Amino acid sequence: MYQSLMTVRETQIAIKEVKTFFEDQLAKRLELFRVSAPLFVTKKSGLNDHLNGVERPIEFDMLHSGEELEIVHSLAKWKRFALHEYGYEAGEGLYTNMNAIRRDEELDATHSIYVDQWDWEKIVQKEWRTVDYLQKTVLTIYGIFKDLEDHLFEKYPFLGKYLPEEIVFVTSQELEDKYPELTPKDREHAIAKEHGAVFIIGIGDALRSGEKHDGRAADYDDWKLNGDILFWHPVLQSSFELSSMGIRVDSKSLDEQLTKTGEDFKREYDFHKGILEDVLPLTIGGGIGQSRMCMYFLRKAHIGEVQSSVWPDDLREACKKENIHLF
C-alpha cells in the first residue's frame, strides 16, 4: 500500500522549497521578470484561455458596470497582451504566479478544479519561430528540473533521483507511427516509460490518421511549434505532464487555425485582432504546474496531497482507503 515519504507538516515545508528554487531559477535562466496576474478578465476581451475549446469558464457580472467577467483558466493570452502593454522587447519576458479555477476538469489523481502554475511568456523574433528554438527552451527548463531534483536530494535523500540525463524529443506523428494500435494517452505512457522524460512536439492539429493527439485551443499555440513535457512518475507508474508550452500563433497560423476550428467569430476580439494585424508581439510561453511539480518531486500519489482544493466525499473516502491523505 502507498505510504507518503513525508508527514503533512514536512510536506508543506518541502512544497515551499520546491516552489522557491524553481521560481528563482526559471526567472534567472529564461530572463523573466515577475508581474502581478489577474484572477479574472472581461469576457469581451477574448483574453481568457479556453484550453481545448469546450471547457466553461466561471462567469459573473460586475455591480458597478454590469460588465461580464470570467475567472481565468490560464493566462496564455493575457501574458502576450501584457508584454505589449508593458513595452517588453525581443528576448525579454515575464512570469506570474497564476491561480485559476477550471470547473469542468475531470477529477483524478493528477487533476483538480484548482490550478496553480508558473505562467511565463517571452518575446521572440520572427526567425526564432522554429522547432530548434522551441527545443532549446525545453532544454533550459529541463535543466532546472534536473537541478531541482539534485537540490532536493541533498536535503531529502530518501526521495531518490529518477530523471534521466537528457530529455527525448518526439513528434506526435512519430508517436502515432510507432504505436498505431495505442490511444494517444497510452502512447504517452509507453514513450515516457521507455525514456523517463520526453517532450512531444506538435499538439492540436489532426494526425495522418485524422485523429488529434490532443486538443488545443486555436488562438494561442502554433500547433506545429508546441508540445508537452512528460515524465514517468515513479509512484503512479504512468506518464505525468509537467508543462504545456509552445511558440504562439502569428497572423498566418491564427488565421489557419481559426478556420480549421470554425471559430471565425473570434477574429473580432481585441486580442485576436492584435495578432491578425501584427500589433501584438511574437512570443513563446507556457505553464508549469506548481502542484504537479510538487507531486512529482515529493513522490506523491495524489495532487490533493500538495494543494488545498475541494474533493467529492466518495473520492476522499477512496483515497483514505489507499492511505492517501488529502489536504
UniProtKB/Swiss-Prot annotation:
Assigned EC number: 6.3.1.1
Pfam families, A to Z: AsnA (PF03590)
InterPro entries: aa-tRNA-synth_II (IPR006195), aa-tRNA-synth_II/BPL/LPL (IPR045864), AsnA (IPR004618)
UniProt-listed SUPFAM superfamilies: Class II aaRS and biotin synthetases
Pathway: Amino-acid biosynthesis; L-asparagine biosynthesis; L-asparagine from L-aspartate (ammonia route): step 1/1
Subcellular location: Cytoplasm
GO-annotated molecular function: aspartate-ammonia ligase activity; ATP binding; catalytic activity, acting on a protein; transferase activity
Catalytic activity: L-aspartate + NH4(+) + ATP = L-asparagine + AMP + diphosphate + H(+)
Keywords per UniProt: Amino-acid biosynthesis, Asparagine biosynthesis, ATP-binding, Cytoplasm, Ligase, Nucleotide-binding
Keyword field contains NADP: no
GO cellular component: cytosol
UniProt GO BP: L-asparagine biosynthetic process
Alphabetized HAMAP family for the sequence: AsnA
Matches recorded under PANTHER family: ASPARTATE--AMMONIA LIGASE (PTHR30073:SF5)
Family to which the UniProt record says this protein belongs: Belongs to the class-II aminoacyl-tRNA synthetase family. AsnA subfamily.
Protein name, entry field: Aspartate--ammonia ligase
Native species: Bacillus anthracis
